[in-house]
Amino acid sequence: MHISGLVSAIKGFTHMDQAMVAEPVEIAPGLGNTIAVLRSKASKKSAAVSIDVENGLPSVRGFAGELNQIWGNLIDNALDAVPEKGLVEVTAKRERGRVVVRVMDNGPGIPASVRERIFDPFFTTKAMGQGTGLGLDIVRRLIRHNDGSIEVDSRPGRTEFRVELPIAEDAEVAQ
């Protein structure tokens, strides 16, 4: 990637809006910028990151900066979890009147005993100095602030985080 492309991606990724009310946000640019910013981390593991956004996906009602923080945390965690030459898949599509974003990886999975605690503040499975244990707590809070929900499904060899967000009202009319 050229330097100008990386700078552009970082600017898009760090878009910390100061909006006081939720507004229509397109999901695809935020996901694309997040993946561009994390591309070098993926390269270090020879990991592949794929993205598949449904054509004509409506905008969601939310806060762009917060949504980008959500994508950054989920995709970064997925890259931490995958083995060498692992795979992280990101999809976004419309389901049941909402936009659903999935971040899936082929890492070892999250044991059930740990899964119950992953959204707890200060809970981490990472080595000392490698994480604060706040990432998924913050993700859950930001998703709630954007009127969304998050679920995790994990088994050995696969973990999926599923984020549902409301479609912007004017996007609903445009469909």
Stretch-by-stretch model annotation:
Residues 135, 139:
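Short alpha-helical Gxxx[C/S/T] motif in the catalytic ATP-binding
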Residues 105:
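Acidic ATP/Mg2+-coordinating residue in the GHKL
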Residues 147-148:
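Conserved glycine-rich
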Residues 85-97:
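Short beta-strand/loop element within the Bergerat-fold HATPase_c
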Residues 77-79:
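Short helix-loop "hinge" at the ATP-lid/N-box region of the Bergerat-fold HATPase_c
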Residues 142-144:
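Detector for a conserved hydrophobic position within an alpha-helical segment of the HATPase_c
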Residues 98, 110-122:
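Short conserved segment of the HATPase_c
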Residues 48-58, 95-96:
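Conserved catalytic submotifs in the C-terminal HATPase_c
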